[in-house]
Amino acid sequence: MVQEEKAMEAINDALRALRKRHLLEEGAHAPAISALSKPLISQGSEWKEKTEKLETELQQCYKAQSRLSEQLVIEVAESRTSKAILQEKELLINDLQKELTQRREDCTRLQEELEEKTKTVDVLIAENLEIRSQLEEMTSRVQKAETENKMLIDRWMLQKMQDAERLNEANDLYEEMLAKLKANGLETLARQQVDGIVRRNEDGTDHFVESTIPSTCANRIHAHEGGCGSIVFEYNSGTLFTGGQDRAVKMWDTNSGTLIKSLYGSLGNILDMAVTHDNKSVIAATSSNNLFVWDVSSGRVRHTLTGHTDKVCAVDVSKFSSRHVVSAAYDRTIKLWDLHKGYCTNTVLFTSNCNAICLSIDGLTVFSGHMDGNLRLWDIQTGKLLSEVAGHSSAVTSVSLSRNGNRILTSGRDNVHNVFDTRTLEICGTLRASGNRLASNWSRSCISPDDDYVAAGSADGSVHVWSLSKGNIVSILKEQTSPILCCSWSGIGKPLASADKNGYVCTWT
């Protein structure tokens, strides 16, 4: 705008200069015109006309010049605008050229990446084809193995049925011998006749004793400060071992209710106990992740079995050997221990925490009860799972084997007690009572030594006794007020012992 104003001002100055010059020239020639006008009066009118005509032409020239000046100003402005637009276009072209160069570089890079990805895809396709080939081969092998496994299972089931039939025949013979024994009192003759079938002779220390139905509290003992978590009798004896939260193991005479001795050295609460078949050692599973083995005669710790990484909640010892012990802990392992060597000889791994275990009569199979409610059977030598049964809807708290080894009792947090046939793993009895509620994940039930009764404690302090053959309650024992944690039956038929959460132990006859 400033430049346009300057241009208009310059044009106006030029017009004024021309008018001034015209006036000066007109004034300068006025005398000559006057002198000539005299002789030329005759031509005055002609010259006047020409003058007027020239003035008219001059005015037209001025007007044309003014229009040209205005047009010039417009053209100059348009030229400057076009120049600015041209500069903008040049800048835009430069930016577009740079962007084009960048896009070309990106295109080159993407092309290289595409080639690399294509090569990778080709390699993956080749690997996929190879894996598919391997998968087809493995599938074929699995199908073949499944077929062979099915055949082996069928053969094993057939063999199992045959073994069960033979065992049933032996049991029938055994029951017949027991009937004769009870009728005629020929105990010695009966034991010799059935020796090698179910029972061993007196040298093996197992013999038949008829159990009595407990009804009376013979002794009420304050055994431990805090809860008493485990009790166990010596084999074929009335001597009772108790273990509690005070980390002590105590030995009691159940006839008089007096303390025989105390065993110290445990670094944790006693959660479970077992006594060797020769009654020389007692083993305690503790919350300190260890097992402690005491020599009963000296009262000293013979072994400290280390290897578990969490609390050891269950332990059992071989029925025939005083050498082999199994334990279960919350590190989800079962360990086999050699007491002669004092260390672990085998470890079994599983996924659900184990609350209770027991060994079979031959010491080759471990029965374990787990938090998922299942009963599992393990080959202790190979560590392989032999079988699994869904026995309870909640955690299994106790696993007990009958004296003849044909039945196994499991108790669960669903307040149900199941009796399984160890040969077929079928439930042959289910025991429950409206007032019987288990107090903890380690509430222990037990079977009487003659395999006729089952005893289990309840959270209300009572102990329920069922007839195994009839499935009905034959006795309810009420003396304790705290939740019952465990029960144990003496191998000589009586007494039955129960321990509660306050550390009291009652013996029942």
Curated annotation (Swiss-Prot):
Function, as annotated: May play a role in autophagy.
Keywords assigned: Autophagy, Protein transport, Repeat, Transport, WD repeat
Family membership noted in the UniProt record: Belongs to the WD repeat ATG16 family.
UniProt-listed Gene3D superfamilies: 1.20.5.170, YVTN repeat-like/Quinoprotein amine dehydrogenase
Species assigned in the record: Arabidopsis thaliana
Segments annotated as WD repeats: 223-262, 265-304, 307-347, 349-388, 391-430, 437-478, 480-509
GO biological process, one term: protein transport
Protein name: Autophagy-related protein 16
Pfam assignment, any one: ATG16
Domain of life: Eukaryota
InterPro entries registered for this protein in UniProt: ATG16 (IPR045160), Autophagy-rel_prot_16_dom (IPR013923), G-protein_beta_WD-40_rep (IPR020472), WD40/YVTN_repeat-like_dom_sf (IPR015943), WD40_repeat_CS (IPR019775), WD40_repeat_dom_sf (IPR036322), WD40_rpt (IPR001680)
SUPFAM superfamilies to which the protein is assigned, alphabetical: WD40 repeat-like
Keyword Endoplasmic reticulum: no
PANTHER family recorded: AUTOPHAGY PROTEIN 16-LIKE (PTHR19878), AUTOPHAGY-RELATED 16, ISOFORM F (PTHR19878:SF8)
